Amino acid sequence: MNSAPLSTPAPVTLPVRSIPGSYGLPLVGPIADRLDYFWFQKPENFFTKRMEKHKSTVFRTNVPPCFPFFGSVNPNVVAVLDVKSFSHLFDMEIVEKANVLVGDFMPSVVYTGDMRVCAYLDTSEPKHAQIKNFSQDILKRGSKTWVPTLLKELDTMFTTFEADLSKSNTASLLPALQKFLFNFFSLTILGADPSVSPEIANSGYIFLDSWLAIQLAPTVSIGVLQPLEEILVHSFAYPFFLVKGNYEKLVQFVKNEAKEVLSRAQTEFQLTEQEAIHNLLFILGFNAFGGFSIFLPTLLGNLGDEKNADMQEKLRKEVRDKVGVNPENLSFESVKEMELVQSFVYETLRLSPPVPSQYARARKDFKLSSHDSVYEIKKGELLCGYQPLVMKDPKVFDEPEKFVLERFTKEKGKELLNYLFWSNGPQTGRPTESNKQCAAKDMVTLTASLIVAYIFQKYDSVSFSSGSLTSVKKAS
């Protein structure tokens, strides 16, 4: 999909420049870059230092994983770190997305039923359109019960938080939050109730956590003391048998309890039962549960930061002016009228995108433009964009390092949505079978807005610190 105006041909006035940087010596270069990425510099500093060194937002480097036990993985990438160059990742005429969800490394298909699920398919593959249309149909049908289900599950979660606060000074966020997410998305995406199985109800979210962690371990930092993390986590791919039993329990849960959705997948979208089951689990586990498990703690952390007391007051006022304190007034339509609440959600996604790195492979030779230069990209080269840096492009965003509540309000704010790319495309874009933009792009931002509105209907103020809820003041 073209993300105009950024994907328009480069102006002829821009100079053509060879791509700076190098991949270093064989074996040595990739390992040195891997150690910088995970250990000595960390990802954002890794890209920042190279951007400063080369005086360019486009350069060659290596990204993990790599040698010694990833011999089939090519770590060579062309980094694209400004808004203009990054936007080429969404132009499906010049790039393709087969098997590059997390770079040249792809977790074994045994994690997904011995098949490539939709996230690993290119738009040119017929199966992509079938599964993308199926996922959009799921969301459309789920939207009918989305809001009441969300409010019910939020009531349960915040009752747990309040009970924990009554016993101690803090309520740990992640366990209750992930249980909430698992229940909510099982009900709305699968049409399946986890409570029918005590094991799934109590441990389903843990099964998903371990399934995700084992697959993605070579590509993410988990905070283990170095060099143990490099030796034990980033040096090899973990075998599926470690999570096989629990994954098969999730497969059985979907097969038994999501029969209506599975039937529709087969009759209306010509998918096999196995294709539907494993794609549903990937949508549930990676896209919905995994994405929100990263996004919501950040959203709540921004909301509950003591430094943002003034921001809470503004958000609370907007929520109560629009919908009062009655949860029955909350709807997709009502939160669309909350300009500040939506801007708060967008600004969180700008500074902390749930999926920080995005990749695409050149479908053909083409000319890639940054703000100040044009570069020749060869067919087959892998492009890598690190969003936390891209979204701080000073040529697009004023005060890019600062959290600005009102950034996405009024006409200028609406224009900036063209350059908000957290969803694998611009916020103003439309997910279709011909692009790779997140099918739930709008549902994510509306759901987050509903959660913020719910909180300020229920509470005058909230405080979060170090992954815990530390205080609440109920609505007066």
Swiss-Prot record:
Coiled coil: none annotated. It comes from the Eukaryota. One of its GO terms (molecular function) is heme binding. It is a single-pass membrane protein. Reversibly inhibited by nordihydroguaiaretic acid (NDGA) and irreversibly by salicylic acid. Belongs to the cytochrome P450 family. This is Fatty acid hydroperoxide lyase, chloroplastic. The lineage of its organism: Eukaryota, Viridiplantae, Streptophyta, Embryophyta, Tracheophyta. The gene is HPL.
